[in-house]
């Protein structure tokens, strides 16, 4: 299978796309064509998560032999998750289930792809017989950073540098990054938001700095979901959801199910859409936004407009206005690299673009959008705990609030089972979780965690609890205009080590 840029005719192999991350023209890599539907439940029901991952991903990385892919998924998913099923799907009622994606090393859904991605990248690097070092440059709105740092920690031949908004993540998320272990990692806060960090990194990928670094022996790549090595492993868990629902008799063999995804950078919900294209019987696919509702407005109007106030919310991983993976969705909807290139240029120049009526009819046939206010989010957290004895993090609560409102309005078929994607452990956000339980947060987030645990009986995950006594190793904060300089300094450090 070949991969091409969303903006031009640039074409590469899957292994080349893995290492490069971003196309030379600034576009994102997509398959030259998506695989035809190939999923048959009867053939898949007996598979473990790692076996299912190998089967599904072999259709997207067909330049990796089957036995090699099985070994990679086995190494990635063995002993790295707290539950044997990797992604437990918990039935809450006849109407809906929760797909828990927070049982990995950093308590967030990013662990599912970032446990495997380092293995894929190292494999691709070996196959290309390229002796250069790889520097992973990553922007994070909270969860990707820690998951990427943990995934690439001490991986030979690979280094990772993460940029996060210094005032835009939760205290626990910040501790996870600032207290990261490893001899090949670097963490830097920025004065700005996630869009600033991601936008600057995209410019770096198209700059002379990338060329200079390559001449020094350091290649740039990305661990954000702009990289196919992040995106396609996420497809697997939507297939897993389907099989889990069948095993639990939540749906019948010929029934569909709806999926609600709390959405920031659009990678997670795009993976759900791709899963549907290859045969997962997803009915309604719902994109849930928080107060930064640029996507919800797009689905309503057909216009993507970032000329608006940016809100710092209690669901920081969704505090994004420029959703990078939306570019891929536009490509699939329009089928035109010229249209995508023009829209992305308009977004850069004016902060706004609109789709044609024909394209929007296709979009609305594939996906719906909704949003939840901070009040609706917190009420959802309280109500679900009171009714179902289930504690949600704020991102999952946004998804539930959108689902609940759409269900009341009749926008979701009442007879169709719905899966809400639970993207992070609630204990990563102790302040808002405590408030939703009627508790007053303590000044120290770890004291707040203990208070929540005492009330709910839910143990503090080891991965979070052990942070309290660990020293902070990364406290640098730079202006977004200084990010390129910080990257070049780290490149020089890497070269000095070698």
Predicted regions and their residues:
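PLP-dependent amino-acid enzyme catalytic core
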Residues: 1-498
């Amino acid at each position: 299978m070949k991969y091409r840029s969303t903006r031009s005719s640039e074409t590469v192999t899957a292994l080349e796309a893995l290492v490069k991350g971003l196309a030379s023209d600034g576009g994102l890599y997509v398959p030259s064509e998506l695989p035809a539907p190939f999923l048959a439940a009867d053939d898949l029901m007996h598979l473990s998560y790692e076996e299912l991952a190998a089967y599904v991903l072999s259709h997207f990385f067909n330049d990796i032999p089957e036995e090699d892919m099985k070994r990679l998924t086995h190494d990635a998913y063995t002993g790295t998750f707290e539950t044997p099923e990797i992604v437990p799907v918990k039935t809450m009622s006849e109407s809906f289930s929760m797909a828990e994606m927070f049982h990995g090393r950093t308590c967030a859904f990013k662990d599912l792809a970032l446990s495997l991605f380092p293995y894929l990248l190292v494999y691709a690097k070996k196959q290309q017989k390229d002796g250069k070092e790889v520097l992973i440059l990553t922007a994070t709105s909270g969860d990707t950073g820690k998951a990427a740092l943990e995934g690439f920690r001490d991986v030979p031949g690979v280094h990772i540098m993460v940029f996060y908004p210094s005032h835009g993540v939760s205290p626990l998320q910040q501790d996870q990054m600032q207290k990261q272990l490893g001899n090949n990692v670097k963490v830097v806060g920025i004065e700005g938001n996630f869009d600033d960090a991601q936008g600057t990194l995209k410019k770096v990928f198209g700059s002379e700095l990338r060329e200079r670094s390559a001449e020094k022996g350091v290649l740039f790549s990305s661990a954000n979901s702009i990289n196919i090595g992040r995106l396609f492993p996420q497809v697997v868990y939507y297939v897993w959801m389907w099989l889990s629902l069948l095993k639990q008799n939540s749906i019948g063999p010929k029934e569909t199910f709806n999926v609600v995804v709390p959405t920031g950078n659009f990678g997670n919900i795009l993976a759900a859409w791709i899963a549907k294209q290859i045969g997962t019987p997803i009915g309604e696919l719902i994109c849930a936004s928080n107060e930064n509702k640029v996507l919800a407005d797009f689905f309503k109007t057909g216009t993507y407009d970032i000329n608006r106030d940016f809100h710092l919310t209690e669901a920081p991983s969704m505090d994004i206005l420029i959703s990078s993976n939306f570019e891929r969705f536009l490509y699939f909807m329009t089928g035109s690299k010229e249209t995508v290139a023009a829209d992305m240029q308009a977004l850069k120049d004016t902060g706004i673009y609109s789709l044609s009526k024909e394209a929007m009819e296709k979009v609305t046939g594939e996906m719906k959008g909704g949003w939840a206010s901070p009040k609706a989010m917190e009420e959802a957290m309280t109500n679900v705990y009171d009714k179902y004895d289930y504690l949600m993090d704020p991102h999952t609560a946004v998804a539930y609030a959108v689902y609940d409102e759409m269900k009341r309005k009749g926008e979701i078929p009442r007879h169709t089972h719905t899966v809400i994607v639970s993207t992070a452990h609630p204990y990563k956000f102790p302040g808002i979780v405590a408030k939703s339980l009627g508790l007053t947060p303590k000044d120290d987030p770890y004291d707040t965690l203990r208070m929540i645990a005492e009330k709910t009986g839910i143990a503090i995950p080891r991965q979070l609890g052990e942070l309290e006594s660990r020293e902070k190793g990364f406290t640098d904060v730079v202006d977004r205009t200084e990010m390129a300089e910080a990257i070049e300094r780290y490149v020089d450090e890497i070269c000095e080590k070698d």
